[in-house]
Amino acid sequence: MQVTRIIPDVPSFLASMMTFDTWSILFMVVQSLVIFLVVVIVAAMMIIYERRMLALWQDRYGPNRVGPFGSLQLVADMLKIFFKEDWTPNFTDKFMFTLAPAVAMFTALASFAIIPISPTLGVADWDIGILFFFAMAGIAVYAVLFGGWASANKFSLLGGLRSAAQTISYEVFLGLSLMGVVALTGSFNLRAIVEAQADGWYIIPQFFGFLTFVVAGVAVTHRHPFDQPEAEQELAEGYHVEYSGMKFGMFFIGEYVNVVLISALMTCLFFGGWLAPFNLDIPFIPPAFWFMIKTLFFMTMFILARGSLMRPRYDQVMNFGWKVCLPVTLINLLVTAAVILIFSPTL
């Protein structure tokens, strides 16, 4: 008597499932996870890089106790924050208190999906890339606001409100500053913007847009001198004063991920992304090398600003944005539109 086989042959079933499209999806998922992991590692290493550079510029020793020349300080810091007590105060809104650092970390990493590291290396090639970045930046505002409100602490709440006002304001200038680049390229796709700079980087025709983008980028990432939401002398660490352990670590790493993100955007929008300077053709240097060198340069500029500039008052920060950055970006956009209309009316 012949028995009908109900359970299919597993190897053949899996083989039938592994089509070209399936392999493409798996490759994209693995590549995305690797890129996100590398971004987190780079952001963590930037913390030690910042401490060493600040020590060099201030003529003092940096971290030098763990490992040869302090090389294992990052490992020590990670172990310390991992084993710290992740304490949630009783008077907090526990759901919002836990959600805030997760949102901060997620939006920072998700924004990296649009960054083209080389012609073939990147998570997503979207025509709405820049719009996606602004969507994530808008959601990130809620992370700080949730953290400040849920902590039930007056310093946290003031820091959260400062952050919301500052970030929303400077995101306006951030968007207007790169609209000139979008107008010249005719696309929101970052890969298309990089490829359009093959004949010349946009730093020259969009110099004033770049200056405003730098200022707004520092303000949006809450870095010194625009670190008003967490001003230690005024707000006792601001919106994350009640956080500890891994929750604080997610806020902390998220801030440095945002620094890497803004540095990468400066590279792609104004400095040709992976393109070599002066159209140099050096076969043994991969395109990703030029991208990383440019991004590292801007990350160093963030650190230099922290070590050399004073923190202005909160009202001065807001006045500078609305009374200086906004007029500059509008004039830059109007001039760019006029030049395009006169010299490239069919663009």
Curated annotation (Swiss-Prot):
Q: EC no.?
A: 7.1.1.-
Q: Is Lipid metabolism among this UniProt entry's keywords? A: no
Protein's cellular compartments: Cell inner membrane
Q: Name one GO biological process term.
A: aerobic respiration
Q: What class of enzyme is it?
A: translocase
The residue ranges crossing the membrane are: 25-45, 95-115, 128-148, 168-188, 200-220, 251-271, 284-304, 324-344
CC terms in the record's Gene Ontology section: plasma membrane
Instruction: Note the superkingdom of the native organism.
Output: Bacteria
Cited PROSITE patterns: COMPLEX1_ND1_1 (PS00667), COMPLEX1_ND1_2 (PS00668)
Name of the protein in its database record: NADH-quinone oxidoreductase subunit H
Species, as recorded: Psychrobacter arcticus (strain DSM 17307 / VKM B-2377 / 273-4)
